[in-house]
């Protein structure tokens, strides 16, 4: 049963975190007649620009969150970012609020330690060897045990912040400091992972819905400093590797529970599949599905959350996405070259509407469909490269 927005019968969805992914979720929810409320720590965030109303609050602050949730009384609370008081979400769920997909899933996946221990120690999924450290002394010992090269990440961060690879002993102190600087919330610990010489990495978008579990065609992606730069779909895989990735994705998403879309990341080495991470919500690499699939990851998430059916997920065309990044720190920006980007065959452009910029901030994405993935990747890079993010004088 779906009510009428802005009436007593309204079905209300509250987004906690209002970036570009939250914006698309809000748009899809509104297509189903859902009343939407956007919450983030800064004003004019992308999802706030399309929601029915919005609130600015520090979502790590329990009291601030409680005030807004009591005021709005949402039917669905949908976390989109890591910097949320997830312990309070567990309390809210016990009080009868519905957290998407579940409060436990949100709590575990906001913290790399929680999800890694669940995957590797409880579910026996293959992962890179790992250690955790709270002090520089523990960190140095962990690096020695894991060996070089190794990958360093804060246990809580977003968009690749604080991630680096230690290749030589000279990198150790820099990596520790960088990880601490990139941490979000209370996540002061870091994870030290053995470097896997993988052939490629994928995101397997996995949907838990009223009719079971479904998978999108695998998405390949390229990262720099842990932050996504481009993605493409489908990623060619052997049948054996794909079947194993789907098996592991089902195991981890069943353990987390609830309904919704999960972005499950894997390293692939031949036919061997290593679990990396999981996000219980749409994934940045999955933005390519806005061009390639009959239902985007955002529509799939909203359908699953609302208990609506999800028939066959179809790949309509090979395609790719490529990010548009800011170069400077500015209070207001404008975009030039959009018309040139849209002249690239098969291209679409999404500008996120972020209120300000900083170096490397993701401000938009170019989406391209083409007869094959290689062509789509080249054209997406070309389209994104034509867009310039410029300060408003």
Swiss-Prot record:
Pathway as given in its UniProt record: Purine metabolism; IMP biosynthesis via de novo pathway; N(2)-formyl-N(1)-(5-phospho-D-ribosyl)glycinamide from N(1)-(5-phospho-D-ribosyl)glycinamide (formate route): step 1/1
Entry keyword set: ATP-binding, Ligase, Magnesium, Metal-binding, Nucleotide-binding, Purine biosynthesis
Molecular-function GO terms, alphabetical: ATP binding; magnesium ion binding; phosphoribosylglycinamide formyltransferase 2 activity; phosphoribosylglycinamide formyltransferase activity
Ligase recorded as keyword: yes
Reaction(s) this enzyme catalyzes, per UniProt: N(1)-(5-phospho-beta-D-ribosyl)glycinamide + formate + ATP = N(2)-formyl-N(1)-(5-phospho-beta-D-ribosyl)glycinamide + ADP + phosphate + H(+)
Binding site for ATP: 112, 153, 158-163, 193-196, 201
Assembly information from the UniProt record: Homodimer.
Similarity remark: Belongs to the PurK/PurT family.
Protein name, as recorded: Formate-dependent phosphoribosylglycinamide formyltransferase
The organism of origin for this protein: Syntrophotalea carbinolica (strain DSM 2380 / NBRC 103641 / GraBd1)
């Amino acid at each position: 049963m779906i009510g009428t927005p802005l009436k007593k019968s309204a079905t209300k969805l509250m987004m906690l975190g209002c970036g570009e992914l939250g914006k698309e979720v809000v748009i899809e929810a509104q297509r189903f007649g859902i009343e939407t409320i956007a919450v983030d720590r800064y004003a004019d965030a992308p999802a706030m620009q399309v929601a029915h109303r919005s609130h600015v609050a520090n979502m790590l602050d329990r009291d601030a969150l409680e005030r807004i949730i009591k005021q709005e009384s949402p039917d669905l609370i949908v976390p989109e970012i890591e910097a949320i008081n997830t312990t309070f979400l567990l309390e809210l769920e016990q009080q009868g609020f519905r957290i998407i997909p579940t409060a436990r899933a949100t709590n575990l996946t906001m913290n790399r330690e929680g999800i890694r221990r669940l995957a590797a120690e409880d579910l026996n999924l293959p992962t890179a060897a790992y250690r955790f450290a709270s002090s520089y002394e523990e960190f140095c010992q962990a690096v020695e045990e894991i060996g070089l090269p190794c990958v360093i990440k804060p246990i809580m961060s977003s968009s690749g912040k604080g991630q680096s690879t230690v290749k030589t002993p000279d990198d150790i102190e820099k990596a520790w400091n960088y990880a601490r600087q990139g941490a979000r919330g209370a996540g002061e610990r870091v994870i030290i992972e053995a470097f896997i010489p993988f052939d490629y990495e994928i995101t397997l978008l996995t949907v838990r819905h009223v009719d079971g579990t479904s998978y999108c065609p695998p998405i390949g992606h390229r990262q720099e400093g842990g932050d996504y730069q481009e993605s493409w779909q489908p990623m060619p895989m052997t049948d054996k590797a794909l079947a194993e990735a789907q098996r592991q994705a089902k195991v981890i998403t069943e353990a987390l529970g609830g309904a919704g879309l999960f972005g499950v990341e894997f390293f692939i080495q031949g036919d061997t599949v290593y679990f990396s991470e999981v996000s219980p919500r749409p994934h940045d690499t999955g933005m390519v599905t806005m061009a390639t699939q009959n239902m985007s990851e955002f529509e799939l998430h909203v359908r699953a959350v609302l208990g609506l059916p999800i028939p066959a997920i179809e790949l309509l065309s090979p395609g790719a996405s490529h990010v548009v990044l800011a170069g400077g720190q500015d209070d207001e920006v404008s975009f030039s070259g959009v018309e040139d980007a849209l002249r690239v065959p098969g291209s679409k452009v999404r500008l996120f509407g972020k209120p300000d910029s900083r170096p490397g901030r993701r401000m938009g994405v170019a989406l391209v469909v083409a007869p094959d993935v290689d062509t789509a990747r080249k054209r997406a890079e070309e389209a994104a490269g034509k867009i310039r993010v410029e300060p408003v004088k």
